[in-house]
């Protein structure tokens, strides 16, 4: 199962994944596992000991209820909560707030999520059937354990105080699809009454309007920012506007310039120099630049300025700008940047993304907003319900377009761009770190007479990141990680391969007195946002993340990136280490290379290190010898394919490439 950080159209946030736990082989397991010893299927009731008796997490039988606290992973350290830092008597790792840890129920023990472990559970669109087994009397049973046998009363209607908020009854572990499955039928083939479900959604905290907080979140230019002047730039298209050299020469509104200055921006980056005049002139744009190069400001500044310069009447449910992002975290980041640049103007900025209350977001949107930032699934949900239409849309921005293609959003992108309500006279802007041929051909359906801008990659910016590669097998990784973090742990992101591995490593580090949190696709949206807040404000020194967090995380003061597990694609390596050393600042990246597992990217890794002036270890050269890899040493993430004879799409005459130094 992949890390699905994409957006679900309708989400029951507290019940997400309803018992669907996967290991490296993509096999699904009940959260409570197979009951052994005293585990009793994770003590399904009062504490909901997560994975109580499952041997495959810590290599031993969990201790049932997790000390009565509902601790994550059941018997982890005498019932201590998630990450080991909170111990006996607490209801969850954040303490008593509900969540999906102890007492609340949902998809975790007790209320119906896993239904005692060996009983079937009602996840997803009807859930898995659960494990059949025989009791001591030899009776075959499925998901109908007596209360005494399953370690606590399930109680379909817990009081709010007991479960941390109003929840759905039995089977709320899935995505709340109202259809019958095997768990609706008892052993006598009688239909089990399907009681009414209640659903609880996460409502994000209101964004701050404090100027200091709004303008202090960005990353200031570093001492190596001047290197950006040496990055090569290629521009393709007809009648291309000339680049700007200063924000003051970009014909932006005064209030936008004031907010740019408050943000600490002094000189535009190469992508901003080229993109701002193109967008201001009314042209479509396909822009290719690496993460951390200022892409977000490159499209927000001219768009917001244009809205102020040429105001149109604001109609409810008809945004004038639609910005689509592949991940929730990136959408939130763009939302915060838009609020910053539109500060003290009359422009209204809205956001819609999955894992949060649809009703709450709809209330915000129906107040009217000029700009909507959205993830694809949730945006289409609003569109399908006619809460959002595109009659007044003047700008459409597809950010991280290559990532959207990788995540399977190509059809969603087509549905948005070709929607019957889409205003014909709109500008389409596509931004990405890479533009492979496939996505350029699809873009040809949407863009007209567009300008293609490619900003040089790797060399200049990555040379600001000191890259170190260690040869470490999988059994030595934890001790090596402790050794590195003992020197300096603050502001460290550790990338791992699996969601389960992220939680396990976060728990391990917390027990070693390194305040650690994790972020991945199986965590509830409230927990994902809380994890980022804790890491940003320094209360958590270390953030464990899966590879999908390698894009979109623009966090101040990230000092160190550690590849605990190497990615399978070299592009992901570049994106990961790009979390540090941003906007001309120094950074540090450390990678654990396991020759048995990571040999396939060795040749590409050697090219990356050589291209950025880094030391290449002998063991890595040996592993990469004879392999050519798939990585190209070209300095650009994409080449305009319109000049090729077999291209079908925009028929614009393409001038010879310009190179702007």
Curated annotation (Swiss-Prot):
PROSITE patterns tied to this protein: DEAD_ATP_HELICASE, HELICASE_ATP_BIND_1, HELICASE_CTER, Q_MOTIF
Motif Q motif in this chain: 245-273
Domain of life: Eukaryota
PTMs per UniProt: Ubiquitinated during oogenesis. Deubiquitinated by faf, which protects this protein from proteasome-mediated degradation.
Gene Ontology cellular component terms for the protein in this record: cytoplasm; germ cell nucleus; nucleus; P granule; perinuclear region of cytoplasm; posterior cell cortex
UniProt keyword list: ATP-binding, Cytoplasm, Developmental protein, Differentiation, Helicase, Hydrolase, Magnesium, Nucleotide-binding, Oogenesis, Phosphoprotein, Repeat, RNA-binding, Ubl conjugation
Annotated consequence of substituting residue 546 to A: Moderately decreased the RNA binding, abolished both the RNA-dependent ATPase and unwinding activities
Residue span of region Required for posterior localization in oocyte: 184-203
Helicase ATP-binding domain span: 276-453
Compositionally biased tracts (Basic and acidic residues): 85-95, 131-172
Enzyme nomenclature, EC number: 3.6.4.13
Biased composition (Acidic residues): 1-10
Family: Belongs to the DEAD box helicase family. DDX4/VASA subfamily.
Protein name, as recorded: ATP-dependent RNA helicase vasa
Source organism of the structure: Drosophila melanogaster (Fruit fly)
Record gene name: vas
